[in-house]
């Protein structure tokens, strides 16, 4: 079983233009993501981009990159294009290009799960939420799972809704995915689904088509960079905790 990590990265962004090239303590964000992910047990790692500036930056810091179409609607679709070309890998790890604090253990946990579950098509991560404001925040996607740790639903709403008082844990979805290569290609050919579109969550397409997603719990939480404010949060966190690339 061979594992390929793919970091989809596009230049255009409605909230933070050119964010993969934003500087964080002397390095671009895409370099932070790449070099921290490179510490994992992946067999290979590549950035999939539609922009020559990002491509050149990755090559310049010693990474691998590939140019892809500008017509993709989400990261998984971009990854599927790479999967069509790189057929020697049977399992893919989708690493978000806007999460510079990624820990290699998160990637390794997905790798181990696929090694242990040969029939698994897709897996992802979750992190326990303790703060009520974080639970209510629609930018924190929540996930609920069955007793075997397969996703029942993902939502920007508070799920489960606390109609009665009870001892229940809330989990934030961490958007790092693992999939079998063939399933990524199959996913890319599925039509967008109603729940996916109303929640703006691409993983719901998988559930609506009747497939399962294994969800592993991680103790690591991430700060995704969608805005300038997020970027400043990451920079401050790195400084305060003396984190190195």
UniProtKB/Swiss-Prot annotation:
One of its GO terms (biological process) is lipopolysaccharide biosynthetic process. It catalyses: 3-deoxy-alpha-D-manno-oct-2-ulosonate + CTP = CMP-3-deoxy-beta-D-manno-octulosonate + diphosphate. It is found in: Cytoplasm. One of its GO terms (molecular function) is 3-deoxy-manno-octulosonate cytidylyltransferase activity. One of its GO terms (cellular component) is cytosol. Pathway: Nucleotide-sugar biosynthesis; CMP-3-deoxy-D-manno-octulosonate biosynthesis; CMP-3-deoxy-D-manno-octulosonate from 3-deoxy-D-manno-octulosonate and CTP: step 1/1; Bacterial outer membrane biogenesis; lipopolysaccharide biosynthesis. Activates KDO (a required 8-carbon sugar) for incorporation into bacterial lipopolysaccharide in Gram-negative bacteria. Belongs to the KdsB family. This is 3-deoxy-manno-octulosonate cytidylyltransferase.
